[in-house]
């Protein structure tokens, strides 16, 4: 974890925002503008996207070229993610409730699965607004049930040894 993140003030909720390599300009712009002036500290590994699209990050958004998602997700109070398998699994393994903005049908399905478990909110990529994003974040910050469910899902995921199970499957299937 970059020292800059560890040194951030702890007086505001920390939001981890990662929209993946499939993020588009419209979604990035809406997410970016949503955080401007919001009462959060935001960390994001989307520096290249912002530079490519010539977008300016608000003062409360700290951009990085790359972040170890498995290390920074547990530090976050809420994540804002695109809903790919990796981002959803990392949020779940970290016990972090999230707002998902699926950019593809598979991502929307991933988000919906966790939303049904009570610790995620899905927003539509074409029509979400700043107000909806901030309300969703605020809802997850205040919702004790969502935080509890996120921790329960984290416990379930920790009970499985994915590496061991994958190795066992490969050996049993392919010798």
Where are these regions (language model features)?
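Donor-nucleotide binding loops and adjacent catalytic segments primarily
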Residues: 1-78
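Short, surface-exposed connector motifs at secondary-structure boundaries
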Residues: 13-15, 92-97, 149
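Hydrophobic, well-ordered secondary-structure elements that form the walls
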Residues: 31, 42, 72, 80, ...
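A donor-sugar binding/catalytic signature common to diverse glycosyltransferases
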Residues: 66-113
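C-terminal amphipathic helix plus adjacent low-complexity
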Residues: 130-175
């Amino acid at each position: 974890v970059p020292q800059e993140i560890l040194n951030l003030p702890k007086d505001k909720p920390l939001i981890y925002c990662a929209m993946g390599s499939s993020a588009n300009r419209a979604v990035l712009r809406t997410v970016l503008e949503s955080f401007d002036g919001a009462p959060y500290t935001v960390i994001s590994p989307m520096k290249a996207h912002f530079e490519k699209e010539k977008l300016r990050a608000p003062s409360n958004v700290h951009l990085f070229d790359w972040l170890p998602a498995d290390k920074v997700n547990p530090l976050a109070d809420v994540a804002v993610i695109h809903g790919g398998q990796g981002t959803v699994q990392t949020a779940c393994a970290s016990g972090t409730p999230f707002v998902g903005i699926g950019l593809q049908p598979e991502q929307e399905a991933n988000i919906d699965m966790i939303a049904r478990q009570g610790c995620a909110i899905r927003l539509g990529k074409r029509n979400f607004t700043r107000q909806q994003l901030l309300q969703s974040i605020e809802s997850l910050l205040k919702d004790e049930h969502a935080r509890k469910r996120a921790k329960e899902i984290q416990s379930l995921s920790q009970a499985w040894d994915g590496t061991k199970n994958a190795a066992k499957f490969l050996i049993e299937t392919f010798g």
